[in-house]
Amino acid sequence: MAGGKGTRLAALTKDEIPKPMVPVAGKPLLLWQVERMKENGITDLIMVIGHLGNKIKEYFGDGEQFGVSIRYFEETEPLGTAGSFYYLKDMIHGDRFVMMSGDLFFDIDFQRMIRFHEEKGAVATLFVHPNGHPFDSDLLVLDANDKVTAFDSK
């Protein structure tokens, strides 16, 4: 998902580039994610774009030069995560998928996460982490079995 305005990074984006295209170690943050997905065998990508999304489309195109296939869903109004899920339902056809924010830097073993998901017979699996700055983040409450029992939106 790469549709947000990136207001908290305005000093870096200057409303000229979308937040997922902020350079990290010489290349756009979103490129790091695309490469990580490819390394994990995930090559059919759908990018949800919005504010300045044309810059993402111009950079990545159909994804061929990066060894992946990229389709786009363009938000004309911000829908949030739930809204994106709703509008993507016809594009994913009930297939297994990974959904992630385009403005995160991570090193996730997606194959391990997918195996965990399948072993648990889960409907959905969330990759979460402890957070030392809860004032600007969504928060989850988990039970002893790591099941989500509550959600507190930022």
Locate the predicted segments by residue.
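Short, flexible helix/strand-to-coil boundary loops that buttress conserved ligand/catalytic motifs
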Residues: 13, 41, 60, 129, ...
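Short, flexible, basic/aromatic active-site loop/helix in glycosyltransferases
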Residues: 144-154
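Active-site/binding-pocket entry motifs
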Residues: 6, 78, 147-148
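Short intrinsically disordered, low-complexity coil segments enriched in acidic
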Residues: 1-4, 111, 154
